[in-house]
Regions:
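PAPS-dependent sulfotransferase catalytic core
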Residues: 1-74
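Generic structural signal for helix capping and beta-alpha/helix-loop junctions
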Residues: 38-40, 112, 185
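Glycine-rich phosphate-binding loop used to anchor ATP phosphates in small-molecule kinases
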Residues: 67-91
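PAPS-dependent sulfotransferase catalytic domain
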Residues: 84-181, 189
Length: 191
């Protein structure tokens, strides 16, 4: 049985580092921002590398959902998915979300905006994903009847191993020490 983890974040929230931790497990496949190409195609926003992203990713949300619910690469038993809440446009049906272990990664708004504005000239509230994250959290809680896991990135960085151990325990999977370190640089799995 596959444990599917959907980490819902906004930009500049250590989401890539979190994905690296899971990717370094022996039993885990990762999926990096699968809705990004669809989001760019639908919104027409001018993001760096937008044409390349649109060309390299699936652009039909139904096919993306199927991939998220499907068998991960190499039939790994853990399937970690890094999602940006702002990429989950309103037209995308949410009925599939209860089939995932939904988690939410947060960071202090001031730190997010400061970090994001260093790489993007114009920043809007929609670019950050705060509103979408709250709406999605509420939707997941309503659909599942459970309280989704929320991880504060600042607190996570203070006690990384303890947080990862508790998270693995919550998911019913063993912790792997390989989650604590990984090689620097880009990976083939980068979206």
């Amino acid at each position: 049985m596959t444990t599917r983890i959907a980490m819902w974040s906004g930009p500049r929230n250590i989401s890539t580092a979190m994905m690296r931790a899971w990717e370094n497990r022996s039993d885990c496949a990762v999926l990096d921002e699968p809705f990004y190409g669809f989001y760019l195609q639908r919104t027409g926003l001018d993001h760096p590398g937008a044409e390349e992203v649109i060309a390299s990713q699936e652009n039909h949300w139904q096919a993306i959902v199927e991939k998220c619910l499907g068998i991960p690469a190499e039939s790994k038993r853990v399937f970690y998915q890094k999602h940006m809440t702002l990429h989950l446009l309103e037209e995308i049906d949410r009925a599939w979300l209860p089939e995932l272990n939904n988690c939410f990664l947060i960071r202090e708004p001031e730190a997010v905006i400061s970090s994001y504005s260093a790489v993007r000239a114009n920043v809007s509230i929609a670019d950050i994903g705060f509103v979408q994250q709250v709406e999605l959290y509420d939707a997941v809680a309503d659909m599942t009847g459970d309280t989704p896991l929320v991880i504060d990135s600042k607190e996570f960085l203070k006690r990384t191993e303890a947080h990862l151990r508790a998270w693995c325990d919550r998911l019913g999977i063993p912790f792997e020490a390989t989650m604590l370190t990984w090689p620097a640089g880009a990976r083939d799995t980068d979206g």
